[in-house]
């Protein structure tokens, strides 16, 4: 079942929202290992390159990045035009710290399937480009990573929802203390508050401060502003977004660092 509500932005305008469209769900090692074993059973009976790709994707989730990279570098040789393989190889390279190669294959994935992930891969590209810029802390603080300010007002909600999707995908892989992701989340909070939802903006400011505690004071000021605006517009939102997003889980978050005796399959 879906629950739909209205929310208010910094100008007092109301917007329609599905409250569960952004949430944080860390990977569960037991579930992933069970899935890996299921895939192994299937691959042992009959090879399927799509299952092989799924095998690599689950290794990535488990934190077995070198093993996953081996899977995707082998697959891309025979299946260079498969979107999932190119995109997963890009992610494997990024998690390996090879951002040049990551950007190459994420862009290749977009060429193969421009509408993938609800047309949100532009966010992934922006983040990789920012990584390659190698900002100093001062430069990062003044950078505009997502360039959301240039988005026409009629399209900003759509763009924000694409950002929410990418954050949902990225956060389970990303440890707390990642300053770049914190900056992206902070920008998301600013534009969400301004153009979509004061309540959800508060949530994103809190998340940004968890990822980078140096943002805590600025985030607190922004949260206070949002709450003042809620009072001005006589908004009595129910903190629905905060209920679906468990801050306590995020505060304990650590990406998985798996140790799995994976099997090598010949690409067929």
What residue ranges belong to the model's regions?
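Start-of-helix register in tetratricopeptide repeats
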Residues: 50, 67, 84, 120, ...
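Alpha-helical linker/edge segments of TPR/alpha-solenoid repeat scaffolds
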Residues: 27, 127-144, 225-258
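Residue at a conserved register position within TPR or TPR-like alpha-solenoid repeats
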Residues: 59, 93, 129, 185, ...
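N-terminal leader/linker segments that initiate helical-solenoid repeat arrays
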Residues: 1-52, 265-268
């Amino acid at each position: 079942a879906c629950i739909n509500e209205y929310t208010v932005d910094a100008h007092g305008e109301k917007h329609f929202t599905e409250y569960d469209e952004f949430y944080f769900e860390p990977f569960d090692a037991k579930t992933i290992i069970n899935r890996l074993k299921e895939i192994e059973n299937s691959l042992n009976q009959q090879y399927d390159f799509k299952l092989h790709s799924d095998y690599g994707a689950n290794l990535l989730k488990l934190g077995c990045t070198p093993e996953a990279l081996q899977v995707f570098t082998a697959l891309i040789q025979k299946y260079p035009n498969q979107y999932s393989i190119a995109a997963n190889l890009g992610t494997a390279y990024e998690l390996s710290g090879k951002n040049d190669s990551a950007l190459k294959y994420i862009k290749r994935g977009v060429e193969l399937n421009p509408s993938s992930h609800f047309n949100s891969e532009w966010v992934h590209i922006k983040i990789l480009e920012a990584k390659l810029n190698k900002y100093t802390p001062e430069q990062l603080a003044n950078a505009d990573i997502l360039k959301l300010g240039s988005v026409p007002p009629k399209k900003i909600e759509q763009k924000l929802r694409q950002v929410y999707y990418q954050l949902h995908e990225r956060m389970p892989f990303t440890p707390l203390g990642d300053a770049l992701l914190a900056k992206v989340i902070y920008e998301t909070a600013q534009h969400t508050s301004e153009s979509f939802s004061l309540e959800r903006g508060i949530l994103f400011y809190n998340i940004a401060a968890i990822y980078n505690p140096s943002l805590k004071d600025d985030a607190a000021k922004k949260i206070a502003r949002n709450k003042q605006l809620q009072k001005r517009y006589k908004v009595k939102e129910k903190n629905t977004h905060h209920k679906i997003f468990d801050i306590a889980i995020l505060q304990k978050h650590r990406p998985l660092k798996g140790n799995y005796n994976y099997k090598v399959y010949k690409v067929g």
